[in-house]
Amino acid sequence: MLFSWREDPGAQCLLLSLLLLAASEVGSGQLHYSVSEEAKHGTFVGRIAQDLGLELAELVPRLFRVASKRHGDLLEVNLQNGILFVNSRIDREELCGRSAECSIHLEVIVDRPLQVFHVEVEVKDINDNAPVFPMSVKNLFISESRQPGSRFSLEGASDADIGTNSLLTYSLDSTEYFTLDVKRNDEEIKSLGLVLKKYLNREDTPKHYLLITAIDGGKPELTGTTQLKITVLDVNDNAPAFERTIYKVRLLENAPNGTLVVTVNATDLDEGVNKDIAYSFNTDMSADILSKFHLDPVNGQISVKGNIDFEESKSYEIQVEATDKGNPPMSDHCTVLLEIVDINDNVPELVIHSLSLPVLEDSPLSTVIALISVSDRDSGVNGQVTCSLTPHVPFKLVSTFKNYYSLVLDSPLDRESVSAYELVVTARDGGSPSLWATASVSVEVADVNDNAPAFSQSEYTVFVKENNPPGCHIFTVSARDADAQENALVSYSLVERRVGDRALSSYVSVHAESGKVYALQPLDHEELELLQFQVSARDAGVPPLGSNVTLQVFVLDENDNAPALLMPRVGGIGGAVSELVPRSVGAGHVVAKVRAVDADSGYNAWLXYELQPGTGGARIPFRVGLYTGEISTTRALDEVDVPRHRLLVLVKDHGEPSLTATATVLVSLVESGQAPKASSQASAGATGPEAALVDVNVYLIVAICAVSSLLVLTLLLYTALRCSAPPTEGACGPGKPTLVCSSAVGSWSYSQQRQQRVCSGEGLPKTDLMAFSPSLPPCPISRDREEKQDVDVDLSAKPRQPNPDWRYSASLRAGMHSSVHLEEAGILRAGPGGPDQQWPTVSSATPEPEAGEVSPPVGAGVNSNSWTFKYGPGNPKQSGPGELPDKFIIPGSPAIISIRQEPANSQIDKSDFITFGKKEETKKKKKKKKGNKTQEKKEKGNSTTDNSDQ
C-alpha cells in the first residue's frame, strides 16, 4: 500500500506539491510501500507502474528495471502488469536486526528518456520468532539459609521480533517454594528473578526442578521454555550487586586496541571467599562483541581489542555478569549500552550505471550518457558528497536525485575532430579534512555517416591511344571519406548512360573497390574521339552518401588505316583505270583524278600523291597534284608521244610510319573524231597499240536518246499507276507533310523524323534511303504541292531489312568513313543533341571540290550499289546555315554527283560525269543544243536558292 503522511493536512498538501514539482523536473520520484516479512513468493506489494505514472506498454521498450544495493532479489516487478511482488523470502530480523525501522530501498530506472525513481518498501514485523532462553537447562544453587523473599536473578528469554511481538511474559510451574518476579526499568528492559517464598529444607528436598515459560505478545502467541535445576546449599547467602544496572558510554570509531571503554563495579556483602567477585560476559553474548571487546575478570574494565567501525554497527549492548566465589557462587548482571561516534574515515564511492556507449556524434544536447550514483558510509556532514567533472569537455553532470548524477551531453560532438573522451568524475565529501574518490569514464564517439566521399578534383582528363588491348587499365579514381568503418568504405560505379546506340558499360568499367577504370574493348579514334562519363563514389553508410567525378577520355589517333583508293571501273583490287585523252589538249588539261581516303585523322589522314617515274627513265607528259590527286598534262601533246601511258600513282599519308597505296592509270592518246575499236575489256586492261577507237559522239547521242525515252516511259507508267492505284496508307498514301527546300545547289527533302519512305512506282515503298536535315531554314509549302508529295513519312512503320544492293563491302567501308570521302559525299553527321549537318575535314587538302569525281569502279572489291552514313573522324568543320554538301552518292550509280555550282569562268573542268575522250568538244555541242534553256534553268535555280536563304 502507498505510504501516507499523518501530519497536518495543509503541510501535507504543500509537501506533496513540492515532491511532484521536483519529480517532474528531474525525472524521478519516491514511493513508499509496506510488506510483511516472511511473505510468500508472489505476494502483492504495490502497483508500481501505475503509481509511477508509467504505461504498461512502455515498460519493456523503456527497459524498466529495479536495482538495489544489497537486496535486489527480494522484490521483483512483473513487466506484464506493472505489479511489485515478493520474489524471495524476506526476514526482517536478518535485514535489520532489532532496529525499530526496517525498509528496503529500491531504485527504479527507465530509459528513453532516462528516469530514476526511489521506492522504499517497509518490512513489517510478524510474530515469527519464538522467545528463546540462553540455555535450555539452568543450574541454580540456593543456600538453605536464604530468607523467604530472597530473589535470584535469572537470564530472561530473548525474542528476535520487535514491538508487541517481542514483549514477553513469564510463567512458572506451580510450586510452593518459588515465584517469578519480573521488573521493568526505564529502558524497557525486563529483569527476571526467582523469589523464594519460604525457607528451603535441603534435607527434605535437595533439588528442585522448575519449568519457566516465556510468552511473547504476538498473535498467535509463541512460547519458549527453560528448565531450572535448583540445588539447595547451605552457604553463601549474599549475591554480588552492581552499582548501576545500566551503563551508557560513547566511543569513537576506529579507537585503537586497548582503549578503555568503561569499568563496571559490583559488591558482595559476604565475607571471605564468598565476597570475591569475578566479572564475565554473559554466555549469550554474540561473537562480534566478544571479538571487539575485552573484559578484565578482576577489576571489571571493558577495553577495545578489535576494529570498531561506525558503518558496521552504530551501537553495542554488552551484558556483564558478576559472580562471587562462595559456595555456591552467586551472581548479578548489568547492561553496558555503547554508542559509536562517527568520524570521517570513509572515502566516497562512485558507481556508474547504465553507461550508454558509444555516443553517436549527432546525438542531441542533454542526451544522458551515464547514470552515476555516489555514496559515503559516513554520516552527517561526513557523508554528504558532491561530484565534479573534468573541465573543458562537451559533457556535464546534472544532479537528478539525492546522491545520483546524470552525465549528459552539453555541446555538439564531432567524431572527425575528437573520436573519444577520457572523463574523470570526482566525488568529494563534506568532512574535515574532506576525502575524495575518482572514476574514469571512457566515452567513445560513434561515427555517423555525415560526410560524403570527396574526390580531389571535380574532373579528370585522360588520354588513351586507340587500339588499346581489352581490359586495359586507363585511370584510377580515388575518393576519400572522412567517416569511419563502413561509413568510410567507398565503392565506385559508373553513372550509366548511352553512348550512341550502346551503353557506356560496354566501353569502360570501374572496379568497385579500387576505383581502377578499365577499357573493355579496343577504342577506335575514328569511331569515338572523346568519351565523357561520370564515376560515382558511394559509401556504405545508412543512408549512403555519394559524389560524382567526370572523366574525359580522349582517344588519340594512331596511323592504323592505309589510304584507300576510290576509282571508277576497277576490274579488281589493284586493277588499272583507263582514260582516253585527245592529242589536241594543251598543257594543264586534267586527264583523270585519283581519289583516296584515309580513315585516320590529322596528319595520319593527310594524303599526298606522287607519280612514279616511267620505265627506263623516260619522261612522260603528265604530272599529279601533290594534294589534289589530279593527273594533268605538263605540256601540249604531239605526234611523237607514245599512244599509251601506264601511270603509277603512289598515295601515302603523313603518319609515323606512313602507309601507302598505289593506283594504276592507263592513258590512251586518241585523235580527234576517232574512237577505240577494241572491246571494253581490251580498252580497260590492254596496253598494246592494236586497240581500235569508236566515235564518242555517236555513242553519246544514242545514250542520250535511250535515256530520254526510258525516262518518258517511266514517268508515263508511274503516272498511270498513281492514278489507278487506290489511296492506301503506306506505300504512296497521304502521310505527314514533307518539307522540300530548293536552292541554287539543288533540292533536299526531309522531315522532322528524318526517315522517309520513297515511292518508286510499283511495290511497297523502300525505307532503306535515309536523308538527314541539312540544317536549312524551312521553305513554305503550298497545300497543292503538299498533297502531291511522293515521300511519305511513316513514324509507325516497322524497321525493314536493308536492301542488299545498298551495302558497301568491308573493304570500302573504311574508305567511305574517311574525312575526304565524307566531305566529298556530303555526309550528314548526327551529334549528341540531335541530327545536324557537319562536314569532316578535307584530309587531302584539296582547295576546292572537283568535278568528274567518280565512285570506286565495280570489281575492285567494292560494291558500287552501296549506301552508308558514318561519323567522320576528328576535327569536323561545322557548316554554316544554309550550306549544303557539295556532292553526295546516288545508290546504284558509279559516280559521286556534285551539286555545288562553280563560277562560269572556272578554269577546271567541273563536269558531273567522266567523259571518254573529247570532253571539250562534247561540252560545246551540249551547250549549243540546249542554248538558252540551260541559262533559264540556272536563273531559276538561283532564284530558288535566294528564296531558301530567306
Swiss-Prot record:
It is a single-pass type I membrane protein. Residues 1-29 form the signal peptide. Pfam families: Cadherin, Cadherin_2, Cadherin_tail. Glycans are attached at N257, N265, N548. It is found in: Cell membrane. Residues 30-697 are extracellular. Residues 777-806, 831-856, 869-889, 901-950 are annotated as: Disordered. The chain crosses the membrane at residues 698-718. Residues 782-797, 909-923 have a biased composition (Basic and acidic residues). Residues 30-133, 134-242, 243-350, 351-455, 456-565, 581-678 form the Cadherin domain. SMART domains: CA (SM00112). The keyword Transferase does not apply. InterPro entries: Cadherin-like_dom (IPR002126), Cadherin-like_sf (IPR015919), Cadherin_CBD (IPR031904), Cadherin_CS (IPR020894), Cadherin_N (IPR013164), Protocadherin/Cadherin-CA (IPR050174). Potential calcium-dependent cell-adhesion protein. May be involved in the establishment and maintenance of specific neuronal connections in the brain. This is Protocadherin alpha-3. It comes from Pan troglodytes. The gene is PCDHA3.
